Amino acid sequence: MVKLQEVRNSLLDEIENIVYRNESKIIKLNTSQIEQHIGFDGNTLENTSSLFKGFYSQNSFTESGGFHRQGELYDFTNSGDFFRGFNVEVLPNLAQIEINSTGTGSGDKASFFRGYYNIFGLTTQNQYILNYEIILPELQRFIKQKIG
């Protein structure tokens, strides 16, 4: 009984550890949504700011040699700072995580990213993957190891 109590008391801390150990997988879930222009709510990523439309206004080449046609949805990969700056944080209540990026910059760049209300976070499908394919198996191993 004491062993079970110890395991129960350590579950939230272990979930936090699991999240941080799998930060790159969680970030990949979010960035893959963005690459498909899908927000956490399942809707298309659209910039709600009147200053920015979220589409390339002219044909342009990227820093990496890629090409964007006028009218294409913005793909967030031009400089790479946005995706490189992604991180995951477990909130103080230990029951929720937050995904964000330090690569949103300041000034116009920050205003541009603020126009996307649904960019950070996981779709229902990716939340399922996080909970049942990433966290649960590791949590089950932890519990099995602790109670023998």
Where are these regions (language model features)?
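Short, Lys/Arg-rich flexible segments
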Residues: 1-148
